Amino acid sequence: MNKDKNIYKGNILDAPIMLDRSYIHLSSFYFFYFASLGAFLPYWPLYLSYKSFTAYEIGIITGTMIGTKIIAPNLWGWIADKTGLRHRVIQFGALSCLLIFMFAPQIENFYPMVLLIFFFSFFWNASLPQFEAVTMNTLGSSYNKYSQIRLWGSLGFILSVLILSFFTSKYGINIIPYCILFFLFLTWVSTLYVKKAEDNTKAESSSLLTIIIKPAVLGILISCFLMQLSHGPFYAFFAIYLTENSYSTNLIGVIWSLGVIAEILIFMKISSWIPKYGLKNLFIISFLFATLRWLLI
């Protein structure tokens, strides 16, 4: 029996022999990808501030990274669909991120940094959506088990944030680009184990506009837009805000980790909550808690 040939085909939960290897390969990507994000989100704005970038410049740099999400995932998704080489898109995106970010420690000026972040995030945003597709194709009908794999991303984020809070306190915030490079390297290595996934879904031929104007789709898009809009200042300036209010990097790491710990608890329970409460109700509740979160901050 050739296990490697079929490792990402069908439903891994129906194949106990292949479960461990598939689970490890999928989970390791999420772990290292979000560990990279754990190094980036809380500490990159602090690093930019340390390098004497202004609040305006930090906002533009952070906004550039988020802005590429509008175009990059759609373009890379189209390439993956046309070529059928989704795993190669993931690997190419991860390697490109690593190579581009190698220049980050040498950049001191605003415009070169914006340019670097633009190209970095253009490839960064290529990997995760395509890997999500690989994961869902691997799970097949057991898509409700997705959270058990995805929670490893949250664990990676927490460990990264907490470990770097210690190292930045000891060695200074200037080590952050090198820490990000380390996690980007591990992310790329994890993509080398991604195999070509068999897409068992049958796509219906519909125009994009026809799909978007559906009330349910339009409602989700508007809700997600507003949620992302509310997170923009948080991602860019929250760590700086805490620093200016005399919080240590150790405490900043703990504060960032608290939200992700809650995320892990949700991932552990969500597969049983969906059939019990319904997606719509869970969606509404999550927005209520998000609103409460901003009010408390």
Model features per residue range: what roles?
Residues Y8-D20, T191-Q228:
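Juxtamembrane intracellular "pre-TM" segments in multi-pass secondary transporters
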Residues L13-I66, V217-I255:
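Helix-loop boundary and gating motifs at the non-cytosolic
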Residues F31, I100, F110-L128, F225, ...:
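Hydrophobic core of transmembrane alpha-helices in multi-pass small-molecule transporters
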Residues I71-L85, T168-S169, L265-G278:
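Helix-to-loop junctions at the C-terminal end of transmembrane segments
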Residues I71-P105:
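Conserved MFS/SLC helix-loop-helix module at the cytosolic interface between two early adjacent transmembrane helices
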Residues R88-M102, N281-L296:
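Structural signature of the two symmetry-related core transmembrane helices
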Residues I117-W152:
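Cytoplasmic helix-loop-helix junction between adjacent transmembrane helices
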Residues I175-L192:
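Symmetry-related core transmembrane helices of the 12-TM Major Facilitator Superfamily/SLC fold
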